[in-house]
Amino acid sequence: MEGKGIRLPKLGILTLIRHRKVKAGGKLKSVTVCHEKDGKWYCSISFEYPKTELVYPKPSEDMKHIGLDMSATHLYVDSNGELADFEKPYKKLQEKLAREQRKLSYRQKDSKNYEKQHKVVARLHAKIKHQRKDRLHKLSEQLTREYDLISIENLDMSGLKQTLNLGKSYSDNGWGMFVTMLLYKGKRNGCYIIKIDKWFPSSKTCSQCRYVHKDLQLSDRTYVCPVCGNLIDRDEQAAINIDLEGLRVLLSA
């Protein structure tokens, strides 16, 4: 690393647009340069830092905890009833992308105009990808710093997409990538990440009296408990139950 650039073998010093400052005290381990479909070059730099002893908070009922229930329309609903502040770039840019893809279909393949339009489409795809990844990074960092315990469901994403025919929605919200970020950032920030058993009836269990509503259908978006009369949004209730179960699992470990 030299000034605002980086020295690479045979290429010399290349100027970099840095997205964040490099933490002091690290040893440069590797540099990966890649050329993406949008025509831009990206450089991924890895540093090694001395190991520091990570201190997790002592498990207790007083610790700050939250449960997250995955959502197709939003990234998640949490146990406080809040929806993730998550931009869905593919939905937002879908109309523009479709328009540019139609233009591409009218171009003669292998012509200069085709190649030019192909780059426009590629840039849109790259913009969507980078917006989504950036937002996921910010959300996962915020949560793992704010909470001592985050509980989520242990879901089979591939099976869920096929069974419920929700592939596009669930691929767009990036839940799998989000969980991966939570796991490694939880270790880094001293936050417990508990995965609840996928067979745990989070949606069917009343968060007030613990009655299990076995006849609840996927189309029922509001939970009405026939025992205590609890009336609550289905996803919010699932998040509350995930939160309670995660805390129980941690305290009993």
Task: Name every feature range the model reports, one short phrase each.
Residues M1-E36:
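Acidic carboxylate diad motif detector
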